[in-house]
Amino acid sequence: MAAAIASSLIRQKRQAREREKSNACKCVSSPSKSKGNCEKNKLNVFSRVKLFGSKKRRRRRPEPQLKGIVTKLYSRQGYHLQLQPDGTIDGAKEEESSATVFNLIPVGLRVVAIQGVQTKLYLAMNSEGYLYTSEHFTPECKFKESVFENYYVTYSSMIYRQQHSGRSWFLGLNKEGEIMKGNHVKKNKPAAHFLPKPLKVAMYKEPSLHDLTEFSRSGSGTPTKSRSVSGVLNGGKSMSQNDST
């Protein structure tokens, strides 16, 4: 019995060794086939990596979008606010002018940037209350949007106000359609009141905020033209110094 088991084990071992030799001979005799299989495996791996990478690129997160409006701003004084190609800010009786169309871009809670659609310039107010235009979005381009009575809206500087009283400085037009100094415009006067006339809803990229110290400034605090910024004080024209009417 024991001898039969032993001979059976020896036979099984011999058969196993023969199978191993046979497999080794096959591998040696057909190296090109093995190489081909290896190449196929490599291609499969690379294709999977490439496919994974392409899927990853397609899944890029979209840039943040802000929902604003393209609108006209009708002053209670009887003019449409307009921003002319030379940077002049004033009022126009003609409603059809493309210079009277603005992008109102939300940049905070009840805070907007006012940008001319035609010129791509931002409205801004400096530390002396003067309105000017800028190619770049800075803290001086931020205006607080407040709803007044009868659906009129006021726009006041977010960073400048009267030092002692704390009274806000407002965007305003006088009876002649001239832009006024912000510290001469009062909230309860028609000069400060604008009625938005929305044309359509639009999606905007969030403007890149530039620091004011990046730009050269004159002694009066009025932005001046430089290589990095175009700041124009009402297109070089005079502004109304009278109190709001």
Curated annotation (Swiss-Prot):
Protein name: Fibroblast growth factor 13
Annotated GO MF terms: beta-tubulin binding; growth factor activity; microtubule binding; sodium channel regulator activity; transmembrane transporter binding
Gene3D superfamilies, sorted: 2.80.10.50
Comp. bias regions, Polar residues: 215-245
Pfam families (alphabetical): FGF
One Gene Ontology CC term in the entry: neuron projection
Region described as Mediates targeting to the nucleus: 1-62
Subcellular location: Cell projection, Filopodium; Cell projection, Growth cone; Cell projection, Dendrite; Cell membrane, Sarcolemma
Sequence similarity: Belongs to the heparin-binding growth factors family.
Cross-referenced SUPFAM superfamilies: Cytokine
Lineage: Eukaryota, Metazoa, Chordata, Craniata, Vertebrata
InterPro entries named in the record: Fibroblast_GF_fam (IPR002209), IL1/FGF (IPR008996)
Annotated region (Disordered), positions in chain: 1-37, 213-245
Keywords: Cell membrane, Cell projection, Cytoplasm, Membrane, Microtubule, Neurogenesis
GO BP: any one term: establishment of neuroblast polarity
Gene: fgf13
Described function: Microtubule-binding protein which directly binds tubulin and is involved in both polymerization and stabilization of microtubules. Through its action on microtubules, may participate in the refinement of axons by negatively regulating axonal and leading processes branching. Plays a crucial role in neuron polarization and migration. Regulates voltage-gated sodium channel transport and function. Required for proper head development, it is involved in neural differentiation through regulation of the mek5-erk5 pathway.
Domain of life: Eukaryota
